């Protein structure tokens, strides 16, 4: 296991011959016709997520060149005309004649699943499959222009909505190699809009640079007449990724523990570090794909970690003979870990096809971690003792939390009704038909109870201070009245007992005042849901109500607006003369009828659905905003101050 990742990947490139990547490596599996008819089947959706997926598809092809050892720099540029250009310095798409009688470049760009991966020689390891993504991008773009630098010349093709508008032409001379793809997404497909979000792309490009040690990715924004450019290059790879994730956290040991190695052409790269907090942050990747459902690589890591730490604790008499072994949850408390494996033929399972199913990977990861962690613990006894003692403290807290949950369950069983007294429940019993409003304070709760539709809307007023769970273990979290009330009302349990199938309401709606205090309560609730009831967020059950900020009366007409811009537009339209304007300071100022009309009536209300688009970034933000350290929070506020209308310092 003495080779580093660079050496392993270089050797793989040698073994694969620095094999010629030519026209014969392109395999045609099926046609392209269905992509424009059913784009969701290929890119997930035609929302903003699907739009950005187009960029990822093209970048994935360049990443494949990097994994194969041929590409060191990828440039992603957002152009002023709304198009995006992805350029790499890889080998370039093959341009020779294909067995179909067409240039290989044309086949790659116009036929779905025509790529260099399928024969096994072009790409020994692949995430995006060269040709799958790029043909889909072509099909879903108003226009596409591809320029290949290969064999001493430029080779160019142009396409529109899946059709060739300019066949391959060869011109000029160049000593460089690589591919440049420029595409403009089709507004006929992406009806919600075709504007790329810089921050969304930045998060993914940074992640890819972390996962591919030594690769440089440049992201440039040329829109609005300005130039904004960032370069991502991490010589330390995922070790730097873990340091980035733990920014602003108090660490058990400032050094990152790292293991890397290879067996049977499976390359494993792991970095881990303990911080003094209570949440576990595990991120797993296969061929640069985020395996959010985990899989065999995660199972191998977990089993090795739990086994080795228990062995170490017993061997060094930190755990006594009469004490039970530490559980997996105990030894992972406060752990931040990134696991990246490169697998020649990955098998993906699970609901979203993001769970690694290759059984052999479990043993490979288990052996690597067992060997590496034992060596680390022998060489770092003080840090080893601190890690084990943290696990023992976690074990005691977990036992206290279990007793608190048992006590809550026993109390509920003894009561005639196990639901909290503050809850105004609905009559409908089918969870799919019901929703619960989490409301701050009694006055707003009173208006909501009177204004709701009792058939399917439940109201739960929260009294007292909501706990910042980012700074507390579960046993202390369960001492909070507000949190215990929510857990009981939802019916799901919490933490390791959480069971989404027992959810009593399919919509959980946070309804707070439209001011700084309301925003703070929303953030506290979202932190709790994210840390201890994450499936509520990932499966789309959490919403944020949008109560109006203003009521405008003119004559007999009543209007409601939700922010200052909307208010000014309305006043410009209807004229300011004769308008009576009321600014709502809180939900309690609305009578039940107004609250129903503006915020609770499904036919008229506006709600935000809480979605988890990037778990890594969400985890980091909760730490920055809700953690103990002031400096990262101040830095974040300074960077984002231009986007803020209410700031409470």
Where are these regions (language model features)?
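GHKL-family ATPase ATP-binding module
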Residues: 1-22, 32, 56, 64-66, ...
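Mature N-terminal segment immediately following signal peptide/propeptide cleavage
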Residues: 23-38
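Conserved short strand/loop->alpha-helix "switch" segment adjacent to the catalytic nucleotide/phosphoryl-transfer site
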Residues: 37-56
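Residues immediately C-terminal
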Residues: 64-65, 92-93, 516-517
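Short conserved segment of the HATPase_c
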Residues: 93-115
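C-terminal interaction appendages of subunits in large macromolecular complexes
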Residues: 396-415, 430-435, 446, 450-452, ...
């Amino acid at each position: 296991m003495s080779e580093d990742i660079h050496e392993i990947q270089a050797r793989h490139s040698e073994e694969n011959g620095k094999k010629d990547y030519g026209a014969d490596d392109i395999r045609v599996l099926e046609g392209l016709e269905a992509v424009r008819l059913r784009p969701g089947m290929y890119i997930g959706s035609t929302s903003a997520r699907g739009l950005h997926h187009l960029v990822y598809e093209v970048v994935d092809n360049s990443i494949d060149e990097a994994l194969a050892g041929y590409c060191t720099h990828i440039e992603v540029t957002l152009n002023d005309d709304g198009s995006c250009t992805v350029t790499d310095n890889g080998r370039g798409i093959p341009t020779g004649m294909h067995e179909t009688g067409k240039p290989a470049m044309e086949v790659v760009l116009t036929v779905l699943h025509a790529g260099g991966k399928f024969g096994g020689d072009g790409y020994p390891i692949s995430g995006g499959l060269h040709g799958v993504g790029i043909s889909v991008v072509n099909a879903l773009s108003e226009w596409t222009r591809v320029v290949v630098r290969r064999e001493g010349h430029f080779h160019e093709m142009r396409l529109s909505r899946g059709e060739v508008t300019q066949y391959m032409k060869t011109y000029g001379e160049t000593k460089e190699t690589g591919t440049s793809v420029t595409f403009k997404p089709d507004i006929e497909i992406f009806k919600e809009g075709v504007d790329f979000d810089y921050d969304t792309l930045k998060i993914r490009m940074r992640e890819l640079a972390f996962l591919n040690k030594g690769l440089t990715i440049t992201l440039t924004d040329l829109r609005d007449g300005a130039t904004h450019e960032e370069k991502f290059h991490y010589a330390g790879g995922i070790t730097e990724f873990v340091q980035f994730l733990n920014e602003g956290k108090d660490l058990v040991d400032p050094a990152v523990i790292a293991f890397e190695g290879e067996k049977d052409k499976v390359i494993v790269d792991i970095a881990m570090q303990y911080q003094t907090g209570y949440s576990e942050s595990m991120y797993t990747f296969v061929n640069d794909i985020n395996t959010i459902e985990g899989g065999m690589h995660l199972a191998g890591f977990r089993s090795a970690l739990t086994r080795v730490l228990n062995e170490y604790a017993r061997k060094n008499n930190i755990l006594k003979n009469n004490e039970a072994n530490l559980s997996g949850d105990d030894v992972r408390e406060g752990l931040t870990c990134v696991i990246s494996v490169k697998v020649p033929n990955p098998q993906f399972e699970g609901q979203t096809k993001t769970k690694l199913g290759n059984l052999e990977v479990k043993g490979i990861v288990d052996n690597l971690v067992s060997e590496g962690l034992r060596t680390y613990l022998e060489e770092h006894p003080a840090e080893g003792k601190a890690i084990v003692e943290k696990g023992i403290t976690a074990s005691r807290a977990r036992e206290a939390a279990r007793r608190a949950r048992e006590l809550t369950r026993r109390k509920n069983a003894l009561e005639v009704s196990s639901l909290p007294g503050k809850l105004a429940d609905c009559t409908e019993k089918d969870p799919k038909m019901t929703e619960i409003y989490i409301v701050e304070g009694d006055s707003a709760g009173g208006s909501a109870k009177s204004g709701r539709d009792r058939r399917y809307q439940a109201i739960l007023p929260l009294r007292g201070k909501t706990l910042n769970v980012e700074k507390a273990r579960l046993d202390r979290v369960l001492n909070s009245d507000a949190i215990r009330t929510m857990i009981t009302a939802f019916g799901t349990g919490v933490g390791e007992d959480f069971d989404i199938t027992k959810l009593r309401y399919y919509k959980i709606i946070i309804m707070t005042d439209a001011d700084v205090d309301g925003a703070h309560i929303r953030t506290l609730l979202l932190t709790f849901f994210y840390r201890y009831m994450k499936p509520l967020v990932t499966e789309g059950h959490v919403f944020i109500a949008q109560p109006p900020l203003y009521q405008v009366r003119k004559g007999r007409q009543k209007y409601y607006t939700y922010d200052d811009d909307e208010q000014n537009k309305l006043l410009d339209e209807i004229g300011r003369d004769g308008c009576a304007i009321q600014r709502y300071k809180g939900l309690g100022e609305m009578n039940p009828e107004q609250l129903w009309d503006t915020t609770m009536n499904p036919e008229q209300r506006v709600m935000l659905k809480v979605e988890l688009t990037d778990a890594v970034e969400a985890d980091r933000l909760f730490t920055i905003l809700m953690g103990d350290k002031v400096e990262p929070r101040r830095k974040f506020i300074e960077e984002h101050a231009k986007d803020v209308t209410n700031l409470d310092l």
